[in-house]
A protein has these predicted regions:
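Basic phosphate/pyrophosphate-binding loop/patch that engages nucleotide-derived ligands
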Residues: 184-191, 246
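Phosphate-binding site of ATP-dependent enzymes
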Residues: 235-313
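ATP-grasp fold ATP-binding core
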Residues: 185, 211-231, 252-261
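ATP-binding N-terminal substructure of ATP-dependent carboxylate-amine bond-forming enzymes
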Residues: 8-165, 169-170, 174-180, 187, ...
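Short hydrophobic transmembrane-like helices used for membrane targeting/insertion
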Residues: 1-2, 8
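Hydrophobic beta-strand scaffold residues
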Residues: 61, 163-164, 192, 218, ...
């Protein structure tokens, strides 16, 4: 059963929130966090930060949480519970379903029938949850890694006819794939590390031959993962099997790369008005200063021994 928002008996919590959403003239922006990914925890921090940063004088943020198992919920609780990964325990999560109608441009929210005004429900409708349509004007997928940065969620919302803030399907899928990204960069004359890609089931002998041709030390990485998950700097032949096993925990493909001595810089580039030929906004170049090792998960999110210089030195 699908009912309009007006059928809800507004008594605070989620329902006051839905009432606010219904009556607002502001663009409704769904902010996705969590996700079926090894980078779930990272996304909780990022998603909470984005929700707090949105100018609520201009936009109505709609928190949409995705569990580790891939279940979608409208979340109506406190943002602190997101960061602490208690958002699913709050009792303020309501299942989300998708409409096959592009003109709906939004979600169907499953609301317990007990929360509806009795005059809106017939006797045979009171036993089951009801679906409430909720349209949104855009989605910010603050998701990391698999099913978030790889073009999959971008494709989902393209099918639903809902604009997505950030990279599109093609750029997301290509940039998440280290092998394909290397091939494209190399074809444009950009230098990339010498590398070798392998699938699960590759023989140990073939791996050793590939590594020997690259030389030690080298890196072993999952092809499609972020936040430095599954990456090992291999110093010699004896460390290779464990590094390969670790990388295969995160993807069915791995890439073995030569180690290049140097330093890392980053630069954000943003397009404008969905026009590929339009003006680009180019951010300041930053530099990562390491005291030891490489920029792994711990250093990326705690900066225990690393520093980031903006602008680069």
């Amino acid at each position: 059963m699908i009912l309009p928002l007006t059928a809800i008996n507004y008594q605070g919590g989620l329902y006051m929130k839905l009432s606010d959403i219904q009556n607002t003239n502001l663009p409704r922006i769904a902010v996705l966090f969590g996700g079926n990914s090894s980078e779930y925890q990272v996304s909780l921090s990022s998603g909470s930060a984005v929700l707090r940063a949105i100018d609520t004088g201009k936009y109505m943020p709609i928190p949409v949480g995705i569990s580790k198992e891939g279940r979608w919920f409208l979340y109506a609780g406190d943002y602190d519970a997101i960061t602490a990964d208690r958002w699913q325990e709050s009792g303020k999560c309501f299942p989300i379903y998708f409409s096959g109608d592009q003109s709906a441009q939004g979600f169907l929210i499953s609301i317990p029938s007990s929360e509806f005004s009795s005059n809106e429900l017939s006797s045979d409708e009171t036993a089951s949850p009801s679906l409430v349509p909720l349209s949104v004007q855009a989605v910010i997928p603050v998701l990391h890694g698999k099913n978030g940065e790889d073009g999959t969620v971008q494709g989902l919302f393209a099918l639903l006819g809902i604009p997505v803030i950030g990279c599109g399907i093609l750029s997301s899928s290509l940039c998440m794939d280290k092998e394909r990204a290397h091939q494209i960069a190399s074809s444009l004359g950009i230098s990339v590390p010498a590398s070798f890609c392998a699938y699960e089931g590759i023989s140990e002998d073939e791996l050793y031959r590939a590594a020997d041709s690259l030389g030690y030390p080298l890196f072993v990485k999952p092809v499609r993962a972020g936040s430095s998950f599954g990456i090992t700097c291999v110093q010699d032949k004896s460390q290779l099997p464990a590094a390969v096993k670790e990388a295969f925990l995160y993807d069915t493909r791995i890439i073995i790369e030569e180690k290049i001595e140097g330093f890392e810089v980053g630069c954000a580039v943003m397009g404008r008005n969905f026009n590929p030929a339009g003006e680009l906004t180019i951010g300041e170049v930053d530099e990562i200063e390491l005291t030891d090792g490489f920029f792994d998960y711990t250093e990326k999110y705690t900066l225990k021994t690393s520093k980031i210089h903006v602008p680069a030195r």
